[in-house]
Amino acid sequence: SDEHLLIVDKPSGVLVVPAAGRSGPTMVDVLKKQLGRPVTAVHRLDEETTGCLAFAFSEDARSGLDAIFRDHTAIRDYLALTTAVPSPESGCIESNLEEGRDGIVRVVRRGGRRGVTHYETVSRRGRGCLVRCRLETGRRNQIRVHLAALGCPVAGDRKYGYRARSGESFPRVMLHSSS
């Protein structure tokens, strides 16, 4: 951290900001209490996703960081443990994404918002693998939807296609924001 911004390692199971119909402390609440000063989330991570999360201490810092994210110049890398190997093992997924009334984000032919995820297989083990994903855009559940569309859902992601196999147990969506 410095006088303008703070990067934290977000744990699983914590919302970044308040959400309708949900209660409990958010990352913003926890940081305000710990630091004794206001903070603003610059971007969001899904509740179950762990890893790097940026906060701004001032409106100027938030505005500057917003511009970096809006212009897609922020490097946003994630690591995902998947239940199958993507084919091809590296590439770019580009599709339009739209959230339905049921809260599920889907790939759509018309409408929606453009989502672009670059991915590469880092290592393989059994039927699954570790995949590095770099976001070009940042849509809700983008990596989870894109990997599921490739036939290799993120381990533990029951919302987007993960089905437990015998002897397999993942306590959460196995997705981590690494930068």
Give the positions of each predicted feature.
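RNA pseudouridine synthases
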Residues: 1-106, 110-116, 124-126, 174
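Pseudouridine synthase
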Residues: 23-27, 31, 99, 126-179
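Generic signature of intrinsically disordered, low-complexity segments enriched in small/polar residues
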Residues: 58, 72, 81, 122, ...
